[in-house]
């Protein structure tokens, strides 16, 4: 199904407060559409949309759907029995899921840049956004986090350039139309949908095949799974990496806060030197991905350097929240063992006496499928506090719990305890934190509130 952006003028979003859904709604408001939507609770995103003219319902009931709506867009997180979804079907209102609708918007742009990969999508999209803005390309941007330089999670440009994250969950990125497709890495995740890593890799192969012959696949040569991707695409390829690739980083060193300095090479030719403003070795790879795309777009070296230098990070990605009594509070969205290790490595390079970590596992299915990997992810912390699992779209069957995870982590010699609620966690932190410690909250749920509660006492 395709969407007529001239004929259809009233669109309703089920789950309008989501990071991507709110961005799509904002794009339509800017284009003059009548926008309505619903969510289970009010948020900064819903309040922002209301200020821009959207009608937002808190609570999802059938009465929110009226016969004058031209299209209903829904998020994959909603139930098949959602009242609004069922009412839209009864009224024969056309339906699109979020990814399909985003694909329809992408059709209106010539140079779609889709950033995929298990880890690093938000940071790389944000880095690329900073560079293209520095180069005055006036892109439209959709990012999975709040980025200060665009004042939120969406920027509406007036050019052929469109930059977006492309998530592999339920193969949603196969509904996109990339001219440049980035694959940052391939790792085991979303195992509630995919059978195994091979099935995940096959999804990325399909994504690569979406890129037209004149387009580009940009991928990390350090990831051995990319070889199969490259051999299956019919487009130009530019690879990057620390170990190998067309674009590489050499002579890497770090400052006292873990931020990298390195030299960027294309084949054996040095292009320029670069200081990143965000910490962690993983961000070298994210930067190389954004540099590769920038070179394809013929963006000048000065614009690349200035764009990356001015990028200070996105919210919830190694975000320094503040200090209290000499304790630095940092928050990170990491929710996969690989991401957690990268975040802890970055924290290790940050000045600290001890690293005290509060982790909130995200979804029961992920905790079960990656249980062994989670138990080994926290070896570098001085103490770990586990909150209860954040369920997101899932129900607790009793099959897994944070206390089970805690038991196995303790067996590895890590000091760990399971404290269920945030108020009790903060009370415990008040008793153990001392000047010079780093308090690191990690997880994709609402664990950031622990740091905020600690700071705002």
Swiss-Prot record:
Keyword Protein biosynthesis: no
Listed GO biological process terms: cell division; cell wall organization; peptidoglycan biosynthetic process; regulation of cell shape
Top-level EC class as recorded in UniProt: ligase
Sites where the protein binds ATP: 117-123
Molecular function GO terms recorded: ATP binding; UDP-N-acetylmuramate-L-alanine ligase activity
HAMAP family on file: MurC
Compartment(s): Cytoplasm
NCBIfam families (alphabetical): murC (TIGR01082)
UniProt pathway: Cell wall biogenesis; peptidoglycan biosynthesis
A single cellular component GO annotation: cytoplasm
EC numbers on record: 6.3.2.8
Catalytic activity field: UDP-N-acetyl-alpha-D-muramate + L-alanine + ATP = UDP-N-acetyl-alpha-D-muramoyl-L-alanine + ADP + phosphate + H(+)
Entry keyword set: ATP-binding, Cell cycle, Cell division, Cell shape, Cell wall biogenesis/degradation, Cytoplasm, Ligase, Nucleotide-binding, Peptidoglycan synthesis
Annotated InterPro entries: Mur-like_cat_sf (IPR036565), Mur_ligase_C (IPR004101), Mur_ligase_C_dom_sf (IPR036615), Mur_ligase_cen (IPR013221), Mur_ligase_N (IPR000713), MurCDEF_pg_biosynth (IPR050061), UDP-N-AcMur_Ala_ligase_MurC (IPR005758)
Protein name: UDP-N-acetylmuramate--L-alanine ligase
Function: Cell wall formation.
Family affiliation: Belongs to the MurCDEF family.
